[in-house]
Structure formats: structure tokens, C-alpha cells
Amino acid sequence: MLRAGLRSSRALGLRPNVVSPGRQWRAQNARVISDTMRTFADKSSISDSRPPVLPGSASEATSEPLPPGAVATPNSAAPTPATPTSSTIPAENVPLTPPPPGVQSPGPPPPSSSPPPPAPKPKRRFFRKFFTTLFLLTTLGFGGGVYYSRINDNFHDFFTEYVPFGEDAVLYFEEQEFRKRFPLISSRASRPPRDTGEQVKIPSQSGVSWRVANENKDSTGRHTSSAKDKVKPSEAVQTPHDSKPADRVKAVEQVKSGNSPVKNSPAPPATPESKPSNVQKDPEVNEPSRAYKKIERIDPINIPNGNEPVVQELVKIMNDIIAVVNADNANARFTSTMDKAKAELNRVGAKILDMKDAALKQADEKIKSSDAEFDRAAMQLMQNFKNQQAEQEAQFRAEYEAERKRIHENYEQKLKSELDRANEVNEKTLQNNLTEQALELKRAFLADVKNRVEQEREGRLGKLSELTSTVNDLEKLTGDFNTVVDQNLKTQHLHVAVEAVRANLEKSQIPRPFTRELAALKEIASDDPVVNAAIASINPVAYQKGVPSSAALIDRFRRVASEVRKASLLPEEAGVASHASSYVLSKLLFKKKGLATGDDVESILTRTETFLEEGDLDGAAREMNGLKGWAKTLSKDWLGEVRKVLEVQQALDKPDYKV
């Protein structure tokens, strides 16, 4: 069924719905295209010399060659068949079952006209960029923190305390800077650590025992020495005086390197018969603790007035040696050597101080001799300066006298020339004054002659000039009078137009439009901005539909007033019962007259009626505008009409005032 529908639509449209790929490039099986539709292969113009291009044949993205054969174009010379092609089957001959597919001969597939697949989108390496950026920012921030920590102390404390590995990095850079600034100190061999890490052994007989110390008095005696079993110092340790100087130097070097000569020396062979007398036994429970001789330490060297760098360096070296000796408990052997070294250092320090004092004295003598020589040179220089000053003063005096004489002569010449010039100017001025006086006398004579001539002519010329001025004044007065006449005529026309509008408003019993009268008024006052503004302020509805007259407003007010009195006692949210009660009670109210006082509805209506009878629409509108609730709602339309009338009256009053 579906295939039959497709065949029928293909036969009616003279154009197959689906084109097989095999017939796409052959001219004899080309699709029938109407002449009115232009495809991609058509030329844009007849005058275009470029050959037609098929879709995909001129694409830069494909390299497939064009298929063989002619290319079918809409302007081809092949005739268009009037009937469908032979492959088209009528709708009544379409079989119910589809025909079997034909066997296609093997061959290369037809070239595809589909566009190449789009290039794959680049992968978003978000995590790599994120971690790279984070690493770079962390490195820059850490490096900047280390650099700023070496400049600012407060930031140094914060950075080393809260930032991980911050203290190690800052210490490393500070140590490198210290080594760079002091290469001699940094190149010196590092001092051996004083803490060797060995376990401390406490003798077994040291400390306090629980037994009383005088329990053994009977057996040992009163003056028994607690150190009687100890070996003499001469037997245990060799004194420094008994050794040779080479041995002592060697022992000091061994001590500095961390090896004790006592430990490295071979032990004497022990005889099996005799036991050493200094062998100590472990104390028993009831045996008191024994006291040992206190080991005296060698005090560090402290030389007074040792401010010299060389002496300080020697003192530091000796103090290091003393510290090593104290650490090895070899005080007894090196005490005399250290004392001798201290004495030598004191002597060296004193000698350096003496040399320093001698150098200071020699420097003082040199300074004094230099001062004396400088004083002599200064005195000689001052004497030379005074001599030169005297010579220059004499020279300047001579030059001054010569210059003064020259200036005096110049001033004499200038004074003489100025006097001559002044005399000449005075003479010229006198001549000019005389000439001016002569001219003035001549003018006075001519004026006198003219006056006499005028008097002789009996004032004929004066009368002619007066007549001319009078004629000019008359011309000016005539021009002003014409202007006044034109202005009065224009004012009269304007007044007539305004009165026509007012008459139309007052005489009309029903509202009538006054568009023609208003147009005439506007034409008359076309160049008057006040009148144009007044006409523009009128509501277009007012002059298109008209406004009621005063009598109509009063008549309508009376009808509105009766309704307002009925609703005067109604609240804002009143029901049917309230309306009925208000209607009944309004009949019982007394009516007021004149300008009644009060803010009730009856007083306001009475005052409004009085204002209307007097012709005061503005006052009536103000009174009615003071109503509230249902009374104001009922009088809203009447107030709107009154406002329109007031707007028109105000617009007409403005030209009236202008007039």
C-alpha cells in the first residue's frame, strides 16, 4: 500500500521521490527538473563564462574525480518527455507484493556525495590545566612568600609558623646568604658535636643511702678518709708537666678530633696475683654512700680589653679547646697548659694594646705635625690672599675712577643734548599754541559773521529747520496711530470672537459643539502665544460635544442634590436596609438656607446651591469636592461637567484679560 502511494505521487509530480545512487550521474536517466527552479549546477547568469559545477565536485574537502559521462543541467538540449518515464507504473497495475530485488553486477561502488565526517572535537583537558595552574600558582606564591619573609619580620613569623616547609626554606636561603657574605667562616671545619650520644653511667656508690652515716664509727675511726682506697692521681693520670711538648700537642689534637689518648693507649698487662687498689665494689644495702672528689672544670678565657678581632679569634679557639678538655674530663692534665696559654694570651693582648697605644701616639704626633704644617700653609695663604686683595683693590679703585670720569663726560653730553632738544620742543609748542589761537579766533569770527547773517535774514533758515522737524514728528505720529488702529481692530475682532464663543455657551439650552467659533478665534489670534496656549488647554471633548450652560448645571444640581440627601446617611459599606433607612430619614431632615456652616452633607449642598445662584461655579465645585462616601460618588458626574465648564471659562478669560 505504501509503495503504491509513492508510485502514484511520483507519476503525478513527474519527479521521483527517491533517486537511486546508480542513476545519479547518467544523462539518459537524469531527473526531470522544471525550468523555473535553479539548482546548484545552474549558472547564475547567461553571461557567466564559468562552467557549471555540481555539488561536491569543486569541494576542497574531497579528492574524488568526477564520474564519466555528460552532466545533466536544466538547460540541456534533451527534450523533456510529456509523459512519465517507462519505469513509472500506473497505480492500477501496482502488484500487491513487492518484486524480488534484482541482482546487481559486482563493481566499484558509486562515489558518495555525502560530506566528509566532521573533525573530532578537541578533548577538554580540564584536570591537567587545573593541576598545572594550581602547581604554578602554588610555586609562585611559595617563592614570593619566601622572598617577602626575608624582607618583612611580621610576615616572616607568620610564614614560618603557618605555611608547611616555610621555615626550612627560609632557613636554607638565609644560610646560603650567610655563606655568601662570610666565606671564611663557612669554609671553616665544622665543630664536632658535644653530645656524643653515649649513655651516661652513674657510679653505683653515688647518691644517698638509707643508713645513718655514723653507724660505722667504731670500726673505721673518727678520721677515716672516704677516699683511702683510691689510687693517687700521679698513678692514674699523667700530668702535663711529665709529658713532652710534642705529646701534649698530639693529645690536644686527638681530643679535638674526638679520640681520647687514654682510651687509645694500650692497657698494661694485668697480673693475676695483684688486684688494682682502685677497684670499687658495689655498695651493700646497709653500706653508706661514698663521697668522691669533685672534678674542677677549666674556666673559659676572658681577657680584659680584648676588643681586637685577632685576640677574639684566639680566645674563641682556646675556649673551644677548653670545652673539649672539659668534655673529656682531662682537666688535671691540661690545667697548667691552659693557664700558660691564658697567660700568653693575656701577654699577647697586652702587647697588642701597647702596639695600639703606640700607633695612636704616633698618629697623634703625625696629626699634630700636619696641623702645624696646615696652620703655616694657611697663614701663608692668608698673607698671599691679603696681598692679592690689596693689589686688586688698588686696581679696582683706578678702574672705578676711570669709569666714573667716563660716565661723567657721557652724562654731560647727554644733558647738553637734552637741553637743546627741550628748547627746540618748547619753541615748537609755542608756535603750535599761537597757531591754534589764531584758528580759534578765526572760528569765532566766522560764527559771529554767521549769527549776524542769520539775524539779518530774520531767522529764515531757522524756521525752515523747525518746519522740517515738525513734519517728521507728524509722520511718526501718523505711523504710530496706524499701528494703534490696527491693534485696536485686531483686539476688537478677538473680543468679538470670544463673545461669540461665550454667547454660544450661554444661549444654548443643550450642550452644542463650538468648534467653528473656536477655530475662528484661533485664526484671528494666530500670532498670539497666550491665546493659542489658552485654546490648547481646552479639552477636545468639551468643544467637540459642547458643555452645559449655567441654568442646566443648576437644574441638574437640584436633581443630584435630592439623590445626595437620600444617601447622606449611608455608610461606606451599606446594604439594602441601610439604603432604605437613609431614604426614610432623609425626608425628616431640615433644609438649610444661605451660607450654612458645618461639614455635613446638608450644609455643603446649601452652600453649593448658594454659589450656583450667585454664578460662582468655582466655589460650588470646591464645596462639592469636599463630600465623602456615597455622596461624592453620586455627585461625581456633575463635578466632571462643572470642571469642563470651568476649563472653558478659564480659557476664554485669558484672551479677555489680554484684550
Curated annotation (Swiss-Prot):
InterPro entries in the record: MIC60
Location(s), subcellular: Mitochondrion inner membrane
Keywords: Coiled coil, Membrane, Mitochondrion, Mitochondrion inner membrane, Transit peptide, Transmembrane, Transmembrane helix
Subcellular location, principal: mitochondrion
Compositional bias per record (Pro residues), positions renumbered to this chain: 96-120
Gene Ontology terms describing biological process: cristae formation
Amino acid composition bias (Low complexity), ranges on this chain: 72-91
Name of the gene encoding the protein in the UniProt record: mic60
Pfam families: Mitofilin
GO cellular component terms attached to this protein's record: MICOS complex
Keyword Chloroplast part of the UniProt annotation: no
Mitochondrial matrix-facing ranges: 41-129
Coiled coil: 403-458
Family matches, as PANTHER family: MICOS COMPLEX SUBUNIT MIC60, MITOFILIN
Record bears the keyword Ion transport: no
Superkingdom of this protein's organism: Eukaryota
Mitochondrial intermembrane topological intervals: 150-659
Ranges for region Disordered: 41-123, 187-290
Protein's name in the database: MICOS complex subunit mic60
Family the entry assigns: Belongs to the MICOS complex subunit Mic60 family.
Spans through the membrane: 130-149
Compositional bias per record (Basic and acidic residues), positions renumbered to this chain: 214-233, 241-253
Protein topology in the membrane: Single-pass membrane protein
